[in-house]
Amino acid sequence: MRKALALPLLAIFLGGCASNPADRDISGTWINQVAIDAAAKGGPLREALQAYGPNLEWDVNTKASQARYTNGFENVEGRLLGEKSGAWKVDFYGSSASELKRDGGQLQQAASENEPEQVFDRAQIPVPEGAPIGASFERALYSAYMGGSWTIANGQGEGSTVQFQADGQVSGLPGADRYALCLAGDCASMSSTNDNMWLQLNGQGNAYIFARKGKELEIFQAVNTALADEMPQYTPGERKWLLEKQ
């Protein structure tokens, strides 16, 4: 009789292990790695973000019943309503809702009337304590898209080596010590279909248009074609630099 009971008890024990709560845990910071990987192939940045977006990062705290996300323009906070069959519903205070669940090592955001299905991976690059939501995605993107060493093939400082850091610092590019890539929002609207970045030195800077083609990065002066009382509209002007990835 004892032997007969042993197998059912073992099956129950193994079944409990297979449904480990940790495998369903959605707490933590999750980033849109699919969009980053697409951009890292060396094409237009916003084209990749639009194809695999719109959301870039989720930050979930199941213990506090809180969830928030960013699409690079808006930071939206919601309330977790609880888990049902492995899925968590996020209520954005009556305006809309999202459904999140674990899919292996990824976080899956179910498709809705307003957004497509998306998948997110746990953030791996550390960010400073208290960093705003989106910082994890931004650092991972900067590392994948702008990382490594670049040579100035044409422009001021020709022959010099340029390095763009994940934290927004840049070295070797004349007249700049920090940079920021435009991901969405007003800065994107100002440059139409063109990608743009912000370059600054000692806290003062300007917008620039850029074009990424494989291992080449062209940076152009941004020419504002709008009237003084209108939102700026930037088009590519004189090419300032041609960078080639080493």
What are these regions (language model features)?
Residues 1-4:
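Positively charged n-region of N-terminal signal peptides that target proteins for export
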Residues 6-15:
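Bacterial N-terminal signal peptides
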Residues 17-31, 129-151:
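N-terminal helix-cap/turn-to-beta initiation motif at the start of protein domains
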Residues 36-44, 50-106, 154-160, 170-245:
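Contiguous, well-ordered beta-strand patches that form the walls/edges
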Residues 107-139:
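Short, structured interface segments
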